[in-house]
From Swiss-Prot:
Organism: Variovorax paradoxus (strain S110)
Name the UniProt record assigns to this protein: Large-conductance mechanosensitive channel
Membrane topology: Multi-pass membrane protein
Keyword Transport: yes
Subcellular location: Cell inner membrane
Similarity field: Belongs to the MscL family.
Complexes and interactors: Homopentamer.
Length: 143
């Protein structure tokens, strides 16, 4: 089998196509979650904690050279070691929200699967010869 035909067989398998669809939907879903976090959740969190933008929260771990502005971008550009925990907070909130949304989706999908579960199939009638043998057996058992 040639490499091209093997690749074609691999690429058109159902699992690969399902994976591709999942990746595309996941990318679009990521944008939705980013919007939910940035436009809905973070303003509420900012209202509670008094700050909307957590990305500029940091702790300076070294000495700041003279003439360097005391903001995260300039400190990083100057090579000052900083512990930028604000970006981590934002990413952690994104993760928790994404995990919760995926959990709720999976829960609903499982619920739908249970309600739409196929009824057990009716038992298949035994072949005619088996049915005939059973009748003979039953007639022989009678007194």
């Amino acid at each position: 089998m040639s490499i091209l035909s093997e690749f074609k067989e691999f690429a058109v398998k159902g699992n690969v196509i399902d994976l591709a669809v999942g990746v595309i939907i996941g990318a679009a879903f990521g944008k939705i979650v980013d919007s939910i976090v940035a436009d809905i959740i973070m303003p509420v969190v900012g209202l509670v904690f008094g700050k909307l933008d957590f990305s500029n929260l940091y702790v300076v771990l070294g000495t700041v050279p003279a003439g360097v502005a005391n903001n995260l971008a300039d400190l990083k550009k100057a090579g000052v070691p900083v512990l930028a925990y604000g970006n981590f907070i934002t990413i952690a909130v994104n993760f928790v929200i994404l995990a919760f949304i995926i959990f709720m989706m999976v829960k609903q999908i499982n619920k739908l699967r249970k309600t739409h579960a196929e009824a057990p199939a009716a038992p298949v009638a035994p072949p005619e010869d088996i049915a005939l043998l059973r009748e003979i057996r039953d007639s022989l058992k009678r007194p």
